[in-house]
């Protein structure tokens, strides 16, 4: 199985990584193009474009200015240890074994507005550039047009290398929109997580994000290879619901 997840806004570049093993992102020339565009933006432009405070806009203007593609452990960190936030809290990479971390490198891919498609051990420098940002660039009016078919092709290549034909989409809609499902060369599965609130089951963003991270970890640590094995996911009180599921959207429920 190849797993797709979103990145996180929250970053941790303070804690040292748990391994000295790393790789370099595949699309750094693309990243450089975007950085050049972003460097032309004033902090006030960034604040408007990204809908962030002046303080965060200033921080990211500085990050764009400092960014350079010669990554090492001195100025960058592996993506899986740099990203924090709900999905990554659920995934809890810090407690994986060396073998499990190595397994993530072939099975997990992180979609990114700046870096395109990241392997877990790819080095990244601090940034904020969400996939849904309407950043005008030489290839179009937003990042979806900038990346075009590039990320879909990269997912297909990663799927072929993984030896599987199942793609488990645990990314948000904003990020998965950068992928063209009809061009994927595998079976696409997009799990849904619902929590019971006031007697009704519904997707609650905070819980769903954590559940996506937990499922990604479950696939890695349990060596899940089939849809039947995926349906056995039962962490944090979730259970598979045949009634609420469809062939492409296995649905997991959790009671109040």
From Swiss-Prot:
Family annotation (InterPro entries): YaaA (IPR005583)
GO-annotated biological processes: response to hydroperoxide
GO cellular component: cytosol
Domain of life: Bacteria
Family statement drawn from the similarity comment of this UniProt entry: Belongs to the UPF0246 family.
Protein name (Swiss-Prot/TrEMBL): UPF0246 protein Sbal_1048
Annotated organism of origin: Shewanella baltica (strain OS155 / ATCC BAA-1091)
